[in-house]
Amino acid sequence: REAINTFLLADADIVPHPVDEEGIVLDDAPCDYYYVTPGHQVPTGVAMSQVRRGQLLEHAARHDAVIVEDDYDSESNFTLNPLPALKASDRSGRVIYVSSLSKALSPGLRLGFMVADPDLIDEARALRRLIYRHPPTNIQYQMAHFLAQGHYETHLRRYHFDSAQRWERLNNALHRY
């Protein structure tokens, strides 16, 4: 919902696309930007198939569109093996990848990141400075160290295993009762 509110503030014309078992269903209408959550679509939980990801990339190239890939909550996909990020297949620089470390670590952390063209990152940093003057650099440095040491990957494996077990127990209980 926060993303939609941001787009509305920019006076964007939002056109929702349907989602099926393979992810976003594209039409031929031109679009300037696509905002997608291919790793774990909210609220359906569907992960976008590899075929549909390729179609989206081709569609964006054909219509000169930009894709904003929000990897929000992809760590909560416990039923499928995750596919690589859409950004990993981006050969044209059309995908802006954004994600957060808050879901898997701590909701209060409020630390996210973006993978995009360096010029866009510079612009985003300038905008962030206008909105949020002094982000907590100590937390950023500690998280960079945590990531560099491989601790985040270890934590994610444990988080995924524990959460998948909880999800399985809840799913079984709901089906039983």
Predicted features and spans:
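A generic "structured core" feature
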Residues: 1-12, 31, 66-67, 77, ...
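PLP-dependent aminotransferase class I/II
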Residues: 96-176
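Structural motif
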Residues: 32-37, 68, 113-115
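Short, glycine/charged-enriched secondary-structure capping and boundary segments
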Residues: 7-11, 48-51, 81-83, 111-113, ...
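Active-site pre-lysine segment of PLP-dependent enzymes
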Residues: 28-30, 41, 46-66, 73-104
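PLP-dependent aminotransferase-like
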Residues: 1-47
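Alpha-helical structural signal in soluble globular domains
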Residues: 6-10, 55, 59, 85-89, ...
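Residues that form or flank phosphate/diphosphate-binding pockets in enzymes
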Residues: 2, 51, 107
